[in-house]
Amino acid sequence: MIKYLQSHLEEQGYLFVTLPKPDLAPLQLLTEYKGHLEEYDGSLLDLFEPDGSPFPIRDRQLPNFSGQQLLQTDWSAGADLLHGLFKLFQQKEDKLKASLSGMKGLVLSFAYENIEEERVSEQALDNFLAGAMPKKEGFQRSVERLQDGELYVLTSVMRSNQFTVTIDCQREDQGKLEAAVAEIVDAHASIERKQSNSFSLQTEGEQAFVFACRAAQVLYNKKQWFQFWKKDKDGFRIEKREGMVVRGEEDFSVQPLQAPSGLLKL
């Protein structure tokens, strides 16, 4: 399981994506399963009749987050995350675990560069849902999840096209670590070595991946479910959800790190 420290992102209501993905976007649906959010087929607009006022998707640069260490893990989880990032960047990862395994106390810290946020107004979304009518076709498959409070919608995604990982270990393994990082860099032409124990990898062209997001729970304010198709003052709404993570079927589960008090927050 991945273990992570509380970060600036969590403090501002963002959720981590366990293995960064290129295809997440605002208004995409998620479903809750065993305390995690997972991808769910379709968009919110597939479930409701349009009201003639499209949601503008806005982009903004987030320089304050670029270069910050946003995620820190131990080796047992960091190896999986690094392995997933290498696959996303279409890099061979065969030497990755072999080069770094066996050292004691490995800690991996991840930073992302060139961060952009793609978002939709949560207020506009909530206003839309307050009077929205479900589509009779295609909505029924989601009714049960909605009744159980398991349906979520993405309101914001953070994208990056470059990451830097810094690896720390116990002092007696420092020489081995520097040699291992050199071996990894030598095996991958796209990797740039930053310091003795850190390296950076950037995607080619404009391709970017989503590593964090915001999500809101879709709720329904009506006592009787058979009144779904009647339009009155009651209706749908969203509620922000924090403290969860987003994963796909191939991802590993995530738990917060039980950190001692006074531990530095990243």
Curated annotation (Swiss-Prot):
The keyword Cell membrane applies. The chain crosses the membrane at residues 65-81, 93-113, 162-181, 187-203. GO terms for biological process: defense response to virus. The record marks 247-248 as: Cleavage. Residues 248-266 are annotated as: C-terminal region. GO terms for cellular component: cytoplasm; plasma membrane. Keywords: Antiviral defense, Cell membrane, Cytoplasm, Membrane, Transmembrane, Transmembrane beta strand. It comes from the Bacteria. The keyword Membrane applies. Might be a Bacteriodetes scaffold. Belongs to the bacterial gasdermin family. The N-terminus has marked structural similarity to the mammalian gasdermin N-terminal domain. The C-terminal region wraps around the twisted beta sheet core, probably stabilizing the inactive state. This is Gasdermin bGSDM.
